[in-house]
């Protein structure tokens, strides 16, 4: 690894929607620059997790350093910083964009621009990156390069006269892409003499070496053995190992401004080396940290309970381990009368929640029950105190609270024109407020709505996809809190409140949600020997109820003819037994019943 002048370093990332071919393009680049030997190459080389390969999405960021000899005969170092493409991980995206000077905008030439891509392009423009547009998958029969190029010009506002037409899978146009990175992406600014400032854009936990931090040096130089300080947390560490990612780790002695690499310093948990933090030398610290650091805050909460109570400790251990790798995950112990012991977990968004659940079940072999996701409500009490409530069962009673506010988001959906009507209907049914509508091309329309986050966290995304036959895409951002008449809806089974089924809903929708839920539970809870009432209530007022009829044993089967009083006596005896059973009997609520809340459609 020879020392490279700053003028020959190029730092870039790839912006693309899920499935538009980002990981495949990265694979081809690694192959063409001979960074990864042919025999070691596998598809989606930079996506390490099995889950990423299966879902075809990038969750954790990866980085790769490639040595490339350009057609002008010069040797260059290209640092690819991979980015996750999903809205839940937009903070990670913004940090990895801040570590680059250029971005490849990869668009599927058969699909066109998607909402997520747009959001990331705007982030890239905010960071003043040079954007190189690329049409991918031009070898597909459904490819329409002219239409999509016009769309990029219209929607993103980039000049597409010399747009690169490529097929990452077939390797078409990849040389052209590498050349354009060298000639169009500006080199990093040469600030080797300034005090050290480096940006952390990712970190992961290694069980043997502690946390491995991926960073980009902005100013100055860093060497093995240096004592560094993380400016946001104020903690200090000594660097044991310093290196570059090619994509496998290769140790080096020092890294200077413009370079991308990793270091290990016996850091115990990812929380101590947060994404976006600034690294500086402890002896000669920089005055100001790099701008843009914020702590990732959970937006969506749900309860996770093991189906088998014996697995509680295993679940704690698994969450501890995941937390080492995922600073945005938060959790605290919780007990529920219906489910026993478990944890209340906070996530960045829905995809993040699904991924964490799936990793817990797959990597740690746990069986879990999840409660309906909820958001953070802001409650002002009678005394004027403002409290945050993320669990419906903790909402103060109407007598104790003055107002309840809920988070709102602005959702941008990009969809073919045909589905505009049905998507507007969906947003209206979710208490959406229409803000804007733009036609980009004949086949593409942008819809902007303001929606309560609580209406989006359950199944909005699934509905969006099914109503638009998979063509629509969405992107959202938090816009603040608004006051609404919200109430707590309790579900009572056989007279007992089931805390795991409680939810906070808008007063106008409470009846419809209550009715839909009681009907659903009637189908899912098995019949018992006695009649089981299922009720939805607000406070002490029941607003919807259903009954599960009792199973009956025919006690008159032995009576052939004979006296009516004999039959009456047997029936009364049975009724008495049922009454006693109802008083002391418990109702088993199956796991499917808790999942039913997630798939309600109270229309």
Curated annotation (Swiss-Prot):
Keywords assigned by UniProt, alphabetized: Cell inner membrane, Cell membrane, GTP-binding, Hydrolase, Membrane, Nucleotide-binding, Protein biosynthesis
GO cellular component terms attached to this protein's record: plasma membrane
Topology with respect to the bilayer: Peripheral membrane protein
Enzyme class: hydrolase
The keyword Cell membrane is assigned to this record: yes
GO terms for MF: GTP binding; GTPase activity; ribosome binding
Catalytically driven reaction(s): GTP + H2O = GDP + phosphate + H(+)
EC number(s) given by UniProt: 3.6.5.n1
Main location: membrane
Name of a matching Pfam family: EFG_C
Cellular compartment(s): Cell inner membrane
Chain positions recorded as GTP binding sites: 19-24, 136-139
HAMAP family for the chain: GUFP, LepA
Biological role: Required for accurate and efficient protein synthesis under certain stress conditions. May act as a fidelity factor of the translation reaction, by catalyzing a one-codon backward translocation of tRNAs on improperly translocated ribosomes. Back-translocation proceeds from a post-translocation (POST) complex to a pre-translocation (PRE) complex, thus giving elongation factor G a second chance to translocate the tRNAs correctly. Binds to ribosomes in a GTP-dependent manner.
Annotated protein name in UniProt: Elongation factor 4
Organism (species): Crocosphaera subtropica (strain ATCC 51142 / BH68) (Cyanothece sp. (strain ATCC 51142))
Lineage per the UniProt record: Bacteria, Bacillati, Cyanobacteriota, Cyanophyceae, Oscillatoriophycideae
Gene: lepA
């Amino acid at each position: 690894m020879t020392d490279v002048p700053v003028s020959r370093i190029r730092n870039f990332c790839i912006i693309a929607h899920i499935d538009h071919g980002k990981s495949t393009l990265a694979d081809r680049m690694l192959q063409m620059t001979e960074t990864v030997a042919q025999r070691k190459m596998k598809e989606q080389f930079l996506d390490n997790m099995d889950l990423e390969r299966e879902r075809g999405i990038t969750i954790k960021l990866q980085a790769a350093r490639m040595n490339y000899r350009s057609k002008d005969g010069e040797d260059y170092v290209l640092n690819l910083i991979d980015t996750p493409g999903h809205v839940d991980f937009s903070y990670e995206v913004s940090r990895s964009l801040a570590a680059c000077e250029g971005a490849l905008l990869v668009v599927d030439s058969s699909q066109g621009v998607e909402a997520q891509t747009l959001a990331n392009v705007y982030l890239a423009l905010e960071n003043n990156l040079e954007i190189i547009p690329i049409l991918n998958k031009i070898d597909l029969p459904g490819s329409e390069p002219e239409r999509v190029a016009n769309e990029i010009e219209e929607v993103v506002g980039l000049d597409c006269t010399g747009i690169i037409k490529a097929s990452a899978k077939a390797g078409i146009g990849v040389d052209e892409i590498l050349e354009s990175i060298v000639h169009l992406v500006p080199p990093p600014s040469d600030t080797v003499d300034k005090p050290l400032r480096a940006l952390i854009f990712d970190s992961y936990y290694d069980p043997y070496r502690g946390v491995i931090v991926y960073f980009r040096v902005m100013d100055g130089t860093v060497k093995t053995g240096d004592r560094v300080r993380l400016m946001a947390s104020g903690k200090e560490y000594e660097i044991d190992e310093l290196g570059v990612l090619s994509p496998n780790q290769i140790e080096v002695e020092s890294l200077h401004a413009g370079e991308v690499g990793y270091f290990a310093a016996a850091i115990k948990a990812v929380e101590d080396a947060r994404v976006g933090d600034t690294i500086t030398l402890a002896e000669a610290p920089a005055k100001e940290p790099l701008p843009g650091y914020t702590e990732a805050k959970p937006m969506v909460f749900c309860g996770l309970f093991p189906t088998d109570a014996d697995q509680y400790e295993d679940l704690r251990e698994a969450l501890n381990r995941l937390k080492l790798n995922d600073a945005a995950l938060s959790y605290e112990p919780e007990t529920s009368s219906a489910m026993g012991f478990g944890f209340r977990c906070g996530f960045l968004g829905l995809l993040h929640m699904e991924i964490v659940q799936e990793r817990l079940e797959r990597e740690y072999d746990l069986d879990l029950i999840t409660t309906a996701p909820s958001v953070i409500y802001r409650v002002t009490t009678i005394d004027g105190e403002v409290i945050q409530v993320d669990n419906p069962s903790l909402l103060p009673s109407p007598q104790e609270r003055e107002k309840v506010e809920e988070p709102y988001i602005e959702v941008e959906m990009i969809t073919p024109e045909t589905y505009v009507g049905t998507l507007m209907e969906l947003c209206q049914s979710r208490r959406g407020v229409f803000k804007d509508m733009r036609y980009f091309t004949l086949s593409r329309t942008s819809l902007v709505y303001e929606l309560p986050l609580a209406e989006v966290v359950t199944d909005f995304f699934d509905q969006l996809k099914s109503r638009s036959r998979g063509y629509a895409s969405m992107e959202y951002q938090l816009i603040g809190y608004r006051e609404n008449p919200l109430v707590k809806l309790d579900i009572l089974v056989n007279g007992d409140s089931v805390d795991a089924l409680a939810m906070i809903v808008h007063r106008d929708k409470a009846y419809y949600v209550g009715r839909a839920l009681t009907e659903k539970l009637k189908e899912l809870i098995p019949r018992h020997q006695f009649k089981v009432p299922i009720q939805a209530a607000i406070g002490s007022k029941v607003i919807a109820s259903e009954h599960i009829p009792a199973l009956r044993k025919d006690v008159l089967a032995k009576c052939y003819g004979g006296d009516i009083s004999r039959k009456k006596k047997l029936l009364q005896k049975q009724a008495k037994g049922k009454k006693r059973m109802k008083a002391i009997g418990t109702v088993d609520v199956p796991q499917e019943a808790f999942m039913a809340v997630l798939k309600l459609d109270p229309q």
